[in-house]
């Protein structure tokens, strides 16, 4: 395209014609030789065209292949309520490990059923040891909706069992179950390694000395 501008009869010198036959992206910058150009006479025509030196500069755009990536790390601080729930869960796990209290599947199922039928979401099965019965001690098992200060909480799949600390000294390692019988269905302490014997009703027992 640039070649077509300069015809054979053009009055421009030949070297100028060649100067314009360059790459399309070249920039032609004339450098005036101050020795041949009189700055005092601006209107004087430049006769010696060879006093112009032409330099060609090519503009190149270089892209950096390395792109810096900014990684934003979001740190979420648990709320006070979440921290409290987490702390309670840790305490419950410690209780299960420390006292080795087992809640059977039937116990969990029945206790969850009782909780669904109740208006309160806080339903606990209290198991405690009291003096009495035919063997000297007896279990008292009942459903409550309040925790006492000395209660230790055990939870499995939503079922909550509470045992006071004094009773736990005589019940460590016990298994709490729900038994269904023809005459009577109830929560029972199915096994207690701290006892010597228990009566057939599984309510009264004798402790090891």
Curated annotation (Swiss-Prot):
Superkingdom of origin organism: Eukaryota
TM regions (residue ranges): none
Keywords: Iron, Iron-sulfur, Metal-binding, Mitochondrion, Transit peptide
Keyword Iron-sulfur included in the entry's annotation: yes
Record-linked InterPro entries: FeS_biogenesis, FeS_cluster_insertion, HesB-like_dom_sf
Gene Ontology biological process: iron-sulfur cluster assembly
UniProt cofactor note: Binds 2 iron ions per dimer.
Protein name: Iron-sulfur cluster assembly 2 homolog, mitochondrial
Organism: Dictyostelium discoideum (Social amoeba)
Source taxonomy: Eukaryota, Amoebozoa, Evosea, Eumycetozoa, Dictyostelia
Recorded name of the encoding gene: isca2
């Amino acid at each position: 395209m640039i070649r077509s501008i300069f015809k054979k009869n053009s009055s421009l010198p030949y070297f100028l014609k060649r100067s314009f036959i360059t790459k399309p992206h070249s920039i032609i910058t004339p450098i005036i030789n101050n020795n041949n150009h009189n700055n005092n006479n601006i209107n004087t025509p430049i006769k010696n065209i060879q006093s112009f030196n032409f330099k060609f500069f090519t503009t190149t755009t270089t892209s950096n292949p390395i792109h810096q990536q900014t990684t934003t790390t979001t740190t979420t601080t648990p709320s006070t309520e979440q921290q409290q729930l987490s702390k309670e869960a840790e305490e419950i796990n410690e209780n299960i490990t420390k006292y080795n209290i087992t809640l059977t599947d039937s116990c969990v199922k029945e206790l969850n059923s009782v909780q669904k039928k109740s208006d309160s979401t806080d339903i606990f099965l209290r198991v405690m040891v009291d003096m009495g019965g035919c063997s000297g001690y007896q279990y008292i098992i009942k459903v409550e909706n309040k925790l006492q200060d000395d209660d230790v909480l055990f939870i499995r799949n939503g079922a909550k069992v509470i045992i006071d600390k004094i009773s736990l000294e005589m019940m460590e390692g016990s298994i709490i179950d729900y038994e269904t019988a023809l005459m009577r269905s109830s929560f029972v302490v199915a096994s207690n390694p701290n006892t010597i014997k228990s009566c057939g009703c599984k309510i009264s027992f004798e402790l090891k000395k």
